[in-house]
Design a protein with these regions (language model features):
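Glycine-rich catalytic cores of cysteine/serine-nucleophile enzymes that process amide/ester linkages
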Residues: 3-4, 8-46
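FKBP-type peptidyl-prolyl cis-trans isomerase
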Residues: 1-4, 125
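Exported/periplasmic cell-wall-interacting domains
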Residues: 38-185
Length: 186
């Protein structure tokens, strides 16, 4: 799972640059989207930080706005799940633990971003780095067991590629059927 942490290289709307990489210290579920409460899955897709929790049982935590618009369409309608966080410690069921030092750094960066007036803090969650031989092997292994993953990951790939190419957060929309789409360039 990849949670890119980037900041603007300049104060204007210019490109981002990588400032840190945080390993996910524990996972539950398997590759693929979260679709219902209690499935142990970590969501994959395009999200935002929607809350700050300085009182977390896992040191500190940043809330992820799961379910988003796509999830509300494609997930279990009565019980899609929720309360997904990026947090400290090294245990989790459906969240993304990055350790205490990692969450301290990320939490402060997110607070600083919000204090500078940025209301939306995007978090794009991918199953892995979606390029190169490792990705090809990873995708082949998992889609052989679950062909629906190939169709889902095909929705994530254009935004992943756009960010890697342009170093700007791409605009992603949700189609009426819940599929992600890269918005056309303005």
């Amino acid at each position: 799972m990849i949670l890119p942490c980037a900041e603007r290289a300049r104060e204007d709307a210019g490109p981002f640059r990588l400032v840190a990489t945080y390993p996910i210290l524990a996972t539950s579920g398997g590759p693929g989207p979260k679709r219902r409460e209690g499935d142990g899955q970590v969501p994959e897709g395009f999200y935002e930080i929607d809350r700050f929790n300085p009182e977390s049982l896992f040191h500190l935590s940043l809330g992820v706005n799961y379910p988003n618009a796509a999830d509300r369409i494609r997930s279990h309608h009565d019980r899609p799940g929720g309360d997904i966080f990026i947090h400290g410690k090294n245990v989790s069921i459906g969240c993304a633990p990055i350790g205490d030092v990692g969450i301290e750094q990320l939490y402060l960066a997110a607070l600083d971003t919000r204090a500078r007036g940025q209301a939306r803090i995007p978090i794009h969650i991918f199953p892995a780095r979606m390029r190169g031989a490792e990705w090809i092997g990873f995708a082949a292994e998992h889609t052989a067991r679950n062909p629906a993953l190939a169709r889902f990951w095909e929705q994530l790939q254009p935004a992943y590629d756009a960010f890697e190419r342009d170093h700007l957060v791409p605009a992603v929309t949700v189609a009426p059927d819940g599929r992600y789409r890269l918005a056309p360039a303005p």
